[in-house]
From Swiss-Prot:
Organism: Buthus israelis (Israeli scorpion)
GO cellular component: a single term: extracellular region
Protein's UniProt name: Putative calcium channel toxin Tx758
A single GO molecular function term of this UniProt record: potassium channel regulator activity
Domain of life, source organism: Eukaryota
Free-text tissue specificity from the UniProt record: Expressed by the venom gland.
Signal sequence range: 1-18
Prosegment residue ranges: 19-27
Family from the record: Belongs to the scorpion calcin-like family.
Note on domains (UniProt): The presence of a 'disulfide through disulfide knot' structurally defines this protein as a knottin.
Amino acid sequence: MSTFVIVFLLLTAVLCHAEPALDETARGCNRLNKKCNSDGDCCRYGERCISTGVNYYCKPDFGP
């Protein structure tokens, strides 16, 4: 029984701390809400690379 509890707690700890790797140099994002570095890197025509406070994402550009 105690082995089950230890394995369960270990598995829970691993899953809770598992996060996708943050790639600050992400490229090739060709849809909305994907990380980008600059407009030329990954945003389609009519989109701009805009900061959301933490990361940058491709968003529609509605004007000059």
